[in-house]
From Swiss-Prot:
Native source organism of the sequence: Mus musculus
Subcellular location: Cytoplasm, Cytoskeleton
Bias-annotated ranges (Basic and acidic residues): 471-480
Name this polypeptide is given: Cytoplasmic dynein 1 light intermediate chain 2
Annotated segments matching region Disordered: 188-207, 370-423, 437-492
Superkingdom of the organism of origin: Eukaryota
Amino acid sequence: MAPVGVEKKLLLGPNGPAVAAAGDLTSEEEEGQSLWSSILSEVSTRARSKLPSGKNILVFGEDGSGKTTLMTKLQGAEHGKKGRGLEYLYLSVHDEDRDDHTRCNVWILDGDLYHKGLLKFAVSAESLRETLVIFVADMSRPWTIMESLQKWASVLREHIDKMKIPPEEMRDLERKFMKEFQDYIEPEEGCQGSPQRRGPLTSGSDEDSVALPLGDNVLTHNLGIPVLVVCTKCDAMSVLEKEHDYRDEHLDFIQAHLRRFCLQYGAALIYTSVKEEKNLDLLYKYIVHKTYGFHFTIPALVVEKDAVFIPAGWDNEKKIAILHENFTTVKPEDAYEDFIVKPPVRKLVHDKELAAEDEQVFLMKQQSLLAKQPATPTRTSESPARGPSGSPRTQGRGGPASVPSASPGTSVKKPDPNIKNNAASEGVLASFFNSLLSKKTGSPGSPSAGGVQSTAKKSGQKTVLSNVQEELDRMTRKPDSMVTNSSTENEA
């Protein structure tokens, strides 16, 4: 710092007063020293307070629980691609006060236990103290929650044991985590509303803080690292109430068991919903709070059943016992799987896939079936009746439906479908009528015509009667000579 004073002295000599007082030089040197000291202090403080790199988040959960979707949403991406084995992504962390950025590594283990050996690539003995663990539970399938949490907690415990961390170092991690758990203070009491969104925590002196004793079943499974239990798909609670008849008692029973599990591991509990974007920002803030020590001013939330938040260190058995007041058909000590029963699996009846048969083969089969069928009486009786209508003139008239238009002056009754056909009478009438058509004979007043009409009335076949009447009307319109010749032939 001496050269600074010398430089000032030389500058003051030629341009200012010729001689400077000794007292003035001393004060200027002190100001220069304090200026440099403040600059060096600020630089060193920034270096120490820079956001550390190498922080890790390890995520466990069943397949389909939504763990990848959850972390992708926290990352800020709309759609994430699900990987296989061990997925990797990162969370961007920004310190607004110091305008500093860093990335937090996120490792997502596959739901198949076959891939648990990949954990060695995500967390090592050196990086364990920089790791936060998230257990993801699927609230849309609450009957799998406790079994899943126990399974993944065992996998993590097994992996930590395989690291062969020195016992002294492991005990140091456990003591540090237990102290953080015991030193929890309500945000409204301890962190009086910092207006910043995030900021570094200022820890008080150890002399002022008095650690509260741990209760029963609290931190019985101390892993030495922070743990967070995240329940996803909490918007499915309404579906559980409608389809599975869940009541508030069921939801309180689930929450009570989750909170007891969290007490054993010193974990926090948070209900989320990516679909409704519920508690996602809260989850992000709590993660950076536990990982980087940022300010966190949100207290515990237990009012809304689908937006519960229990920070680590806040809960105890007395607070959990409040949920027991709503129990009517279940006891707090009842087994989880005895009350939250897995619904019976509905067997889906899949229609067998049938290959389309070749069209020609299908038609051949139908032809063979028709050939094997015996001829019915209806077919034999109908064939002669269609004989007269086969003539070009009668066929063109369209059958019985066109009779009224052929002879407007003739009133013919419609055939009665209730009268049974007389096969013998039809045959006689058809043959006689064919002979009349071939010879072009017949008279309206002849006995034969009268006989035909009387026979038609006796047989009750209105269709044949209408055809006869139609032909008689046609023949009456013939020339008189044709009528006279036909009458002579009939008499002969």
